[in-house]
Amino acid sequence: MARKKVDKPVKEMLVIFVEGDADEIIINRLLDHYRSNGWKYESDIKLKNTHGFPDEKKIKAYLTTIIETMSEKIIKFKAVCCEYDTDVFEKGTKQRPDWEKIGNNLRDNYGVNEFCRIEAKTSIEDWMLDDSEGLLKVLHLPLNTNIKGMSGQDKVKSLFRKKNIMYDRSKGKSTIKKYLDNLDISKIANNRKVELKDFENILGVKNNDE
C-alpha cells in the first residue's frame, strides 16, 4: 500500500540583513519600538548581521542556509530587506549594486515576494546622533560638549574616545550595546521616516501622521 503523502507545513518569513553590530542594535530597537506602539507581525523575522556590506552573494548564501536547515518546511520569504550605510557610495569607494536586478533574482530564485532597502544616510552613526543628547548623557559627558568630526562615524568615535571606550561599529556589540540601548529610539524613528518608509510599509507599521 502506497504511503500517504504528507504535505510540508509552510513557514512565512521576513529576513533583514544589516552590515554591522551598531546597525543590528538599532534595527532591533526599531522593531521593539514598533511593537511597543501596537505593531504585530504574523510571520517570523530573522535578522542577519553580515559584518560587511550585504551584497547579493551574502544574501543568497543565507537564504539558502535557511531553506536547507529548515527542509522539513516550505519556506516562503514574504520579504527581504537590506540595511546599509550610503557613505561608501557617496565617497565613490564602492559601486552601487543593481538593486532592481538583485530584487528580481531573489524573486525568481527564492520566491521573495517583496524586496526593500534601508539606506542609513550617511551612516548609522548619523542616525544615532539624532539623539545626541541621549548619547552624551549615557556617556556621562556634558550636554554642551562640542561634537567634532567630519562624519557621523567620526563624531560618535570621538565621543566614545573621550571616555576611553573603543567604538567598533562592526564587531563591538558587547561594548557598545548598553550605550545604544539607552538612546531615544523614537527620535530616530521620527527623524528617519523617509529612509524607513519602505521598511515600515513592508512591516505594516501604521504612523500617527497617516
Segment roles from a protein language model:
Residues H51-L63:
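Charged, often glycine-rich, active-site loop that binds/positions anionic groups
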